[in-house]
Amino acid sequence: MPNRTVFFVSDGTGITAETFGNSILAQFSAKPRHVRRPFIDTPDKAYQVVREINDTAGREGKRPIVFITLIDTEVRGIIRSAHCLVLDMLGTFVEPLEAEFGIKSNHRVGRFDDISKSQEYTDRIEAINFSLAHDDGQSSKNLDIADVILVGVSRSGKTPTSLYLAMQHGIKAANYPLIPEDFDRGALPSALVPHKKKCFGLTIAPERLREIRHERRPNSKYASLENCRLEVSAAESMMGREGIAWLSSTHKSIEEIATTILRDIRPDRLIY
Amino acid sequence: MPNRTVFFVSDGTGITAETFGNSILAQFSAKPRHVRRPFIDTPDKAYQVVREINDTAGREGKRPIVFITLIDTEVRGIIRSAHCLVLDMLGTFVEPLEAEFGIKSNHRVGRFDDISKSQEYTDRIEAINFSLAHDDGQSSKNLDIADVILVGVSRSGKTPTSLYLAMQHGIKAANYPLIPEDFDRGALPSALVPHKKKCFGLTIAPERLREIRHERRPNSKYASLENCRLEVSAAESMMGREGIAWLSSTHKSIEEIATTILRDIRPDRLIY
C-alpha cells in the first residue's frame, strides 16, 4: 500500500474522524499517507477538498480513502462526488439510532454550543491541574480528594498515566514515588498510609527500567540493572504486603494501563 | 431517552468505541447511561456481558444500544445475540477496505504486538516529558528542539493544550507565560526571541479569564476584571506586533485548540 493517501474530512476538528479512521487503518500492515482537512463546513471548502482528492487519485493512480464526519447534506454530497472510497461514520450509524430513539438527531458532530462551559469539561481541566500539582509526590495536600494515587519506583510510568487519566477521564490522579528510603524503612511513605485504599501500583521489568533510566542518567548506580532489580523487587514486596493492587507497565500502552486502573478503581462518579 | 443504557464493548481498551460512540450520541439531546466493558476477548467474558445487557433490557423495558469494537468472530456473534441494537464500527468499515486494498486486515484493533517498543510510542512519552519540563516557562533550555511554544497570559489554557499536543500527537510543546513585566518592557521574553517562528498564542475573553483566576485567587488584583482586560489587550498587541498567530480559547475545547494549532504549524515530521 505505498502511494496511497487517506483523507480525514470533517466539519469540526476532525479528531473523531481521525481517531476512528486510525483504529480501522491499524487493521492493515501498510502505512498510507495521512491528510487532515478539518473545519470543512461550506460547499466552497468542500469543492477545494474534492480537487485535492482527485489530484491525488490522478497522481497516485489509486483512489484515496476518505473518512468523513460531515453533517451538512450538501457538503457531504460534494465530497462523495470525488474519485475516492468514502467511509461515512455518521451517516451509517446516526440514522438507525434516530429510528431506535424515535427522535431526530441534533445534526451536530461531537460539538456543543459551548463545550468550555460544560461541567464535564471544567472537571477535566480541574483534574489536569490536580494531577500536575500532585505529580511525583510534589504535594501531600488534598490527597483526600484524589480519585487514585499511583505508586511505584521512579520511571515506572506513573506521570504519563496520571496525566492521561486526568485528561481523558477527568480523574484526579496523584502519583507518589516509592524510593530506596521507603524500602530501607520497610514502610509506605507516611503521606500514603491514610489513603492506602485508593493507591494503585505500577511496576516494570528491571531490564526495561534500566534502559529508561540509562537514557536519563547514563552509567549511574540509579540506572544499573542490579539497582533496578533491587528497587523493583522491594516495591513489589511492599505493595503485596500493603494490599495494593498493581500491574506491569512493561508491555502496555498508557491507554491500556489507564483502562485497567479505571476498571479496578471504578470511581463512583463514573458508571464504569 | 431516560432509562436508556449504552454499552461500549471492546476487546481492547474501548477508547475507540467510546470516542466514536460519544460523537454519535452527541447528535441526540438526551443523555443515556454509559457502561464500559473493555478487554472482552473470550466467549466467557462475552456471555457475561450478554447477561448484563439482557438484564438491563428487562429492567428498563428498552433494548440497550451497544457499540462494539470486537475482532473475534465468535465473541462478536455472542454479543450480537443479546437483546440490543449493535453498532459495529469495525465490521462495517474494515471489510470494504480489505476489498479496496486487496489485502487481508490484521484483525487487530488499534493494538500492536508491543506498542511500548514502537518508535511512535517512545516519541510520545518523550514529548510528554519535554512538555512537563517546559511548562509555564520553567526552562528555556532546549527550546530549539520544541515543535511549538505556546504563549499567552497566565491561565489562558496553555498547560492543558501543551500536554494534549504531547500526549495525543507526540508534539514537543513548550509553554511560556506573557507577564506584566513583559508588557511594561514592551518586548517578548528574551528566551522566546530566537524562536518567534514557532510561537503560537492563546488568548481568552477577559470576563472568562476573571472567572478562572478568581477561583485560584479570589478577590485579588490578579483576578480583577480590570487587570484581566489590561493583560489580555497588552498580550494581543504584543503578539500582533511580533507576528505571532493566535486564537481564543474562550469557547473552544482543548481538542479544538490543538487541532487548529497543528493545522497552523504543520510540523514537518507529521504529514498534516
Swiss-Prot record, chains A, B:
Bifunctional serine/threonine kinase and phosphorylase involved in the regulation of the phosphoenolpyruvate synthase (PEPS) by catalyzing its phosphorylation/dephosphorylation. Transmembrane segments: none annotated. The lineage of its organism: Bacteria, Pseudomonadati, Pseudomonadota, Betaproteobacteria, Burkholderiales. It catalyses: [pyruvate, water dikinase] + ADP = [pyruvate, water dikinase]-phosphate + AMP + H(+); [pyruvate, water dikinase]-phosphate + phosphate + H(+) = [pyruvate, water dikinase] + diphosphate. Keywords: Kinase, Nucleotide-binding, Serine/threonine-protein kinase, Transferase. GO terms for molecular function: ADP binding; ATP binding; phosphotransferase activity, phosphate group as acceptor; protein serine/threonine kinase activity. This is Putative phosphoenolpyruvate synthase regulatory protein. ADP binds at residues 152-159. The keyword Aminoacyl-tRNA synthetase does not apply. Belongs to the pyruvate, phosphate/water dikinase regulatory protein family. PSRP subfamily. NCBIfam families: PRK05339.1. Its EC number is 2.7.11.33, 2.7.4.28.
